[in-house]
């Protein structure tokens, strides 16, 4: 962290966990295991120390938003409309965004009375592979230009205005948008939007994606650690694909392991690391909270915007 983060307060794990009264995590070890990402590590102690205080903080922000909306309604002399509380979650590939998002979905639905919580990943807003091929940018998949940012903005606008929306579905197994398949997203009490690009600006700079967020989280870690987690995940995906010819990873199961490791490392260097350094990490300071993970995946530091 540099002077770029002077407007953040650095909080140790020990201090953070003391900011919320100790309660029993509202999920079991088995549930936690079922929602964690393929190569991630998380414990019920992490839920107690990190995520329950975070869920409590989010509820504080939600109440503050509702109070402001009520006061604005009085000023405008009209009844304020209830809107979903939208949470953006960003960070590198393989850093654990999905685990954080799925866990928050459970915690908010179980700690806020009668709350409904929707979870959306921005992978569904990637252009289909055929479109990327036609545009000559298949090798730029994951970079800003490979996303239909206007569609993402339109989705956020409609959700913010209380409309239910159907969005495309992306499959990591086939490495493409699934034709004819849609995810129906309700305008719930909370809508969590997770993806590497959620803090980035569309090419139309007059509108910012972050303008739609009521709270935002960046999951951070050292570059060497993220690379190690990415390579580990890549190899584990191969083991799942051994008997699945439809999987994107099946082709790699037919290659010598040395070639596979070399290929995965090259993908990390040329795509994921470049994307992280040029487009993802520079948006880090747009988050309200930064969760920093150590080598063993444990969150050791929290940065809260002042």
UniProtKB/Swiss-Prot annotation:
Its EC number is 2.7.1.33. ATP binds at residues 91-98. It is found in: Cytoplasm. One of its GO terms (biological process) is coenzyme A biosynthetic process. It catalyses: (R)-pantothenate + ATP = (R)-4'-phosphopantothenate + ADP + H(+). It is an enzyme of class 2 (transferase). Its main location: cytoplasm. It comes from the Bacteria. One of its GO terms (cellular component) is cytoplasm. Keywords: ATP-binding, Coenzyme A biosynthesis, Cytoplasm, Kinase, Nucleotide-binding, Transferase. PANTHER family: URIDINE KINASE (PTHR10285). Belongs to the prokaryotic pantothenate kinase family. This is Pantothenate kinase. The lineage of its organism: Bacteria, Bacillati, Bacillota, Bacilli, Lactobacillales.
């Amino acid at each position: 962290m540099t002077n770029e983060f002077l407007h953040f307060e650095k909080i140790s794990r020990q201090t953070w966990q003391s900011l919320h009264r100790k309660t029993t995590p509202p999920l079991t070890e088995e549930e936690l295991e079922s929602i964690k990402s393929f190569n991630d590590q998380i414990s019920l102690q992490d839920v107690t120390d990190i995520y329950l205080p975070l869920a409590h903080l989010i509820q504080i922000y939600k109440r503050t938003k509702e109070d402001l909306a009520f006061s604005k309604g009085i000023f405008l002399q009209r009844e304020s409309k209830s809107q979903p509380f939208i949470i953006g979650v960003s960070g590198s590939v393989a850093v654990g965004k999905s685990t954080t998002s799925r866990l928050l979905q459970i915690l908010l639905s179980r700690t806020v009375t009668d709350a409904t919580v929707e979870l959306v990943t921005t992978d569904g807003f990637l252009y289909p592979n055929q479109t990327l091929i036609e545009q000559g940018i298949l090798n730029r998949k994951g970079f800003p230009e490979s996303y239909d940012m206007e569609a993402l903005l339109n989705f956020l606008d409609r959700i913010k205005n209380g409309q239910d929306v159907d969005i495309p579905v992306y499959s990591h197994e086939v490495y493409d948008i699934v034709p004819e398949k849609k995810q129906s997203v309700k305008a719930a009490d909370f809508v969590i939007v997770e993806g590497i690009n959620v803090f980035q600006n569309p090419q139309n700079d007059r509108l910012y994606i972050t303008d739609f967020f009521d709270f935002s989280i960046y999951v951070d870690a050292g570059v060497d650690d993220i690379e190690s987690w990415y390579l580990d995940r890549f190899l584990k995906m191969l083991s799942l694909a051994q008997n699945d010819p439809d999987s994107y990873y099946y082709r790699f199961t037919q290659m010598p392991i040395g070639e596979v490791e070399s290929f995965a490392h090259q993908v990390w260097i040329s795509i994921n690391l470049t994307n992280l350094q040029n487009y993802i990490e520079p948006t880090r300071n747009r988050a309200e909270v930064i969760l920093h993970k150590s080598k063993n995946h444990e969150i050791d530091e929290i940065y809260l915007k002042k």
